[in-house]
């Protein structure tokens, strides 16, 4: 497809003037002059931090591989013309040449933003401010691009033709160019992966579009809105240039599908809590289903009681067989209940410590009372009254023998008492008879 392009004859040695703001020279401002003046005073911590993250900007593009093409900063692009049109000079270019020229024109992020955004608009200033601090030299590059953009628009205004029939013919003959350009642009990297922040925050319809939707898409609507918002743009009819190829319905549908997919994902993520809250609040007549909580595995604390074999044998208590079986069953049931309760290790440890402390206090009280009872029983036995080291078994045996002897003496005394009562009754009856005989 032919393209009418007017080139400015310049030497490649002079291209350094156009990209000079991208480099740092030794004559520029030294931010650490205070440190050079006084070596004893160290720099501030903030200066060290910014010095560590100071990076050079992306180097400029290489010169064109074609000898006839010069730097994209000095290319004035004219509208398309079909083959055989004599209105503009220049020859015809192949698809590879056209893609190379478009790549040079749309190669950098700064140039893309300057094509879409007006350099005098507040959104372009916000784009400069929103960039990270490590992108040094950004403002100088933006200034250079804005100046070159003014020259582009002036050259385009002078070289464009107001013939509407020619614009219609350009629209009809540029479909093949659009297919080649869309095929080449499909291999581009999504700028949202590199820079996830939006280009602007304004909601005006004439502002810049987001980088993932229209910064790299060959859409004529976004470029038309940017040219209308720019004060330097001319009120000429829509004429397609090299940097604004026409769009077809298939491309617009693909872009719309991409935007809809992104919107669906974001809406699904944002509306998930609201849907969950709506499902959590059922109607008044229905039964509410509790929300499904994630499964959390918790460790169960198993209480293990070890016997203290170093304790003296005197502290043990001989329980009866029935009582011992009952206590063992109760202990087993407690262990089973403790195993069923799966709580956090810290809470289970604290509960076990409290239970063990309470159990120790009660056990100590019980042992003290038992010891006092044994001491009292020992004092009642005449044989062991003064024996403080008498074992519990001897105390129990002597106490049993003493009780049996006391019971025998009790029976003897009871029988003697009965005999004495009977004799008293007899003596009393005899006394009554003597009184009656004397009277």
UniProtKB/Swiss-Prot annotation:
Keywords tagged on the record: Acetylation, Activator, Chromosome, Cytoplasm, DNA-binding, Glycoprotein, Isopeptide bond, Nucleus, Phosphoprotein, Proto-oncogene, Transcription, Transcription regulation, Ubl conjugation
Phosphoserine: residues carrying this PTM: 6, 62, 71, 81, 151, 159, 161, 293, 314, 329, 344, 347-348
N6-acetyllysine sites (modified residues): 143, 148, 157, 275, 317, 323, 371
Bias (Low complexity) ranges: 201-237
Region (Leucine-zipper): 413-434
Skewed-composition ranges (Acidic residues): 251-263
Annotated Polar residues bias: 335-347
Modified residues (Phosphothreonine): 8, 58, 315
GO cellular component, one term: nucleoplasm
InterPro entries in UniProt: bHLH_dom (IPR011598), HLH_DNA-bd_sf (IPR036638), Myc-LZ (IPR003327), Myc_transcription_factors (IPR050433), Tscrpt_reg_Myc (IPR002418), Tscrpt_reg_Myc_N (IPR012682)
Segments carrying motif UBR5-degron: 355-364
Gene Ontology molecular functions: DNA binding; DNA-binding transcription factor activity, RNA polymerase II-specific; E-box binding; protein dimerization activity; protein-containing complex binding
Record has Ubl conjugation as a keyword: yes
Record SUPFAM superfamilies: HLH, helix-loop-helix DNA-binding domain (SSF47459)
Glycan-carrying positions: 58
Domain bHLH residues, every copy: 354-406
Entry's localization field: Nucleus, Nucleoplasm; Nucleus, Nucleolus; Nucleus; Cytoplasm
Cross-link (Glycyl lysine isopeptide (Lys-Gly) (interchain with G-Cter in SUMO2)), chain numbering: 52, 143, 148, 298
Role summary: Transcription factor that binds DNA in a non-specific manner, yet also specifically recognizes the core sequence 5'-CAC[GA]TG-3'. Activates the transcription of growth-related genes. Binds to the VEGFA promoter, promoting VEGFA production and subsequent sprouting angiogenesis. Regulator of somatic reprogramming, controls self-renewal of embryonic stem cells. Functions with TAF6L to activate target gene expression through RNA polymerase II pause release.
Recorded domain comment: The 9aaTAD motif is a transactivation domain present in a large number of yeast and animal transcription factors.
Quaternary state and interactors: Efficient DNA binding requires dimerization with another bHLH protein. Binds DNA as a heterodimer with MAX. Interacts with TAF1C and SPAG9. Interacts with PARP10. Interacts with KDM5A and KDM5B. Interacts (when phosphorylated at Thr-58 and Ser-62) with FBXW7. Interacts with PIM2. Interacts with RIOX1. The heterodimer MYC:MAX interacts with ABI1; the interaction may enhance MYC:MAX transcriptional activity. Interacts with TRIM6. Interacts with NPM1; the binary complex is recruited to the promoter of MYC target genes and enhances their transcription.
Protein name: Myc proto-oncogene protein
